[in-house]
Amino acid sequence: MRYFRLLVLGNGISAYGSYLNMVALNVFVYDATGSALAAGLFMAVRLATNVVSGWVSGRLVSVYDRKRLMVGADLCQALALLSLLLAPDGMRVGLLYALAVITGGCSTLSQVSLRSSIPEIVGAEHRVRANGLLVTGRSLAMIAGFASSGLVVVKLGYSAAFALDAATFLVSATVLFLLPVRTKAAAAGTGSAESSDAARWTARMLLGTAPVLMAMIAVRAVDGLGSSSHNVALPIYSSGLDPDHPATFISQFWATWAIGNIVAQQVIGRVTKKSGRTPGERAFALGACVMSAGFIVVFCGLPTVPAVIAALIAGAADGFTEIIYVSRLQTAPDEQRGRLFGLSASAENTGFGLGMLVSGALLEAFSPLQVVAAFHGLAIALCLALLLVLLRRGGTRDPGVEDKTVDRDASTVTEGRG
């Protein structure tokens, strides 16, 4: 865990760059072209790349060294941003769409590589704690990135924003390169052909041997729909609350959400350390229900204090479910883990991208509460169905998953206890 904390720091710095990049580039596209269509197309290209790169990333991390992939992904993003920074003004617009492909693909590759590597970096018994640290780091990076992006662009300009963004990726790549960590399991004596076959059939095998795990991935995809709905609806809702200061509620919401994430990391880390067991699929389904319900309550027009409390609960449940979900996928054998996280990334990005399009259209005719309730209500319904199936299957089985159940030599993914 000593080296992993440095890795979390580097990952948090690059995550800050990603969120700064997300805001600065979208605004730059609109300012440079004067076209909302061009800005929307830029976002669509990036989201589509995120979806496709999930499948590609799963293949890459199953074959190549993950540390090198993460370093390469950070360097590619830094070089792409520096190219945009140094390009003449007349060429920048054309480079933007190439940049959307590079940043979208590299960010997904980096995420899939890191999540697949955690059991090898820290050991399977420490994966829950490690996932919690990553969730906390990225939550803080998101708040810092969104909060500072406007200030950086307004006060320093786009060139400074792109330079700062590139610097964060260079720092992250340097930290990763220098850390003496192993990101892939030692090669087994059965040869690479068998390992490749195991990875190739992961998705098909999951349908037959781990339907609950596939259901969890489906829940995460629908959660992506819900997440996109409250992201799109939040500025509209905030403007309705205070037209003169719409950013006030947005800042309160995201700051409280981040605090909830940190609380979740602390709680689940202590519970796991004390009990020696990781909350399983049932806890995941229940936590996802609480998360979606919390987001719905935020948009119910409550006074500030109850709304902030709802955001805190939603943030805690969000962090809780993400830690459980990632930790559960990490119980898969190393040669299959990359494909599994690639599939998960594609599903989550598909849900989020589709939700951005649909919720944006629905908000033209319906209120923020109606749209958010519809999308998160769908997630709640799916989670309740999953919870019912788990309860029927589980009977009197223990609801936790022991950390020691990870078998590095296993050849198939099996269901854990929920």
Please annotate each region the language model reported:
Residues M1-G418:
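Alpha-helical transmembrane-bundle signature of multi-pass membrane transport and export proteins
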